[in-house]
Amino acid sequence: MVQHITLHDMTLRDGMHPKRHQISLEQMKDIARGLDAAGVPLIEVTHGDGLGGASVNYGFPAHSDEEYLRAVLGELKQARVSALLLPGIGTVDHLRMAHEIGVHTIRVATHCTEADVSEQHIGMARKLGMDTVGFLMMAHMAPVQTLVQQALLMESYGANCLYITDSAGHMLPHDVTEKLGAVRQALRPETELGFHGHHNLAMGVANSLAAIACGASRIDAAAAGLGAGAGNTPMEVLVAVCERMGIETGVDVYRIADVAEDLVVPIMDHPIRIDRDALTLGYAGVYSSFLLFAKRAEAKYRIPAREILVELGRQRLVGGQEDMIEDTAITLARERGLLVP
């Protein structure tokens, strides 16, 4: 088992989803200062869907990516900043902007079977000298050998770290062990391995520990779990558990707990918890950021969000297909006579 890990904070990026991308600059700066003082080494900052995510499909943020990034970068004493980029949403120009203003790490994210679309962005990030991460989303949807092949593609493009991402919070510890173990064995020894979890089945901490046992040295978490669905792995809990297990994180357990309680919980629009809809995300294997879209469709078409999410899982929809959520709700409403054709 790895004895020292890098914790990567998601509060100011994945946490944008439950906030409908409306975190203010002052809130960003306050939380970033708290994370920095607690010893968190890497903080991700962008629209919830990454650089360039501002759109009708994904939602318009209170401020631009550049404004958020500049605000946070100006507050940090030791932590570095990362940005997420999904090819097809974010562009090479977004990547250059992030590099020019001081972003250290770029994470290029694709669906777990579509690593080939990341070549241009990973190659450019490496050319710019950035810490470059390949980020394979919805990893529960691909068999082990497919994940291995996709990870090796990203590594061949220049990624120096590969993430296996449980975007739906669907994986259990044995799934993590099987998939990350195989990927770790296939990658070059110098290529780092990371894990990003969601807490929809309350497996965030357990899955992170399983990942660490497989050799993952980078683990994503969020203060108070602020993130899509039932949230990300709660950082304050993970730090406490790691400390008890002798795994070094460099993060102060009391300070990160204070950030969660005093800075993050007060800005929540609703409690980040495993309600019936978030549970359905994990159980049915649905992309966590679909949750609020399904709740909005429920209010509009009188179809329970849970039933919409189950149907999305049956259709195996993936990130980027947010426009299909309303279509699915309309179809279900028509089938039940709730809409007149």
UniProtKB/Swiss-Prot annotation:
It comes from Cupriavidus necator (strain ATCC 17699 / DSM 428 / KCTC 22496 / NCIMB 10442 / H16 / Stanier 337). Pfam families: DmpG_comm (PF07836), HMGL-like (PF00682). The record marks R13 as: Transition state stabilizer. One of its GO terms (molecular function) is 4-hydroxy-2-oxovalerate aldolase activity. It is an enzyme of class 4 (lyase). It comes from the Bacteria. It catalyses: (S)-4-hydroxy-2-oxopentanoate = acetaldehyde + pyruvate. This is 4-hydroxy-2-oxovalerate aldolase 3. Substrate binds at R13, D14, S167, H196, Y287. GO terms for biological process: catabolic process; L-leucine biosynthetic process. Keywords: Aromatic hydrocarbons catabolism, Lyase, Manganese, Metal-binding. The keyword Acetylation does not apply. Its EC number is 4.1.3.39. Mn(2+) binds at D14, H196, H198. Residues 5-257 form the Pyruvate carboxyltransferase domain. Belongs to the 4-hydroxy-2-oxovalerate aldolase family. The active site is at H17. The keyword Manganese applies. NCBIfam families: 4OH_2_O_val_ald, PRK08195.1. SUPFAM superfamilies: Aldolase, post-HMGL domain-like.
